[in-house]
């Protein structure tokens, strides 16, 4: 029973690493947190994350921590309460591997210029990284962290597979 949770800002290999893990481990990928979901209200948000916490042998591309970051950044988004967050963390602590993927702001901005994004712009990256640092340092679960400016997606995927096997 494993829940692999990939967190981090845009352009930090979350989807790429998720695809590589899925191929190797045969785990499905679930999109955990999204801008659309964040507009649905607190109860629906909690219900969604609570249901995801019951899953086993899946890869979640963004989960509760991304919600906390983006709901603080974009004020009209729903956010989990501290109590709801701790409830979910308690539920998954025995099976979750929380992976925080990040990079230097200049690396992310360069990748963002190449890829583009309908929600996030280069000017948002510094504040998003700061919020991630705050949120991830307050996470109630052990977190594994990789700088995607220094590690390739292949290296990160191999390391995560080593952690879960």
Swiss-Prot record:
GO terms for molecular function: dTMP kinase activity. It comes from the Bacteria. GO terms for cellular component: cytoplasm; cytosol. SUPFAM superfamilies: P-loop containing nucleoside triphosphate hydrolases. InterPro entries: P-loop_NTPase (IPR027417). One of its GO terms (biological process) is dTTP biosynthetic process. This is SPbeta prophage-derived uncharacterized protein YorR. The lineage of its organism: Bacteria, Bacillati, Bacillota, Bacilli, Bacillales. The gene is yorR.
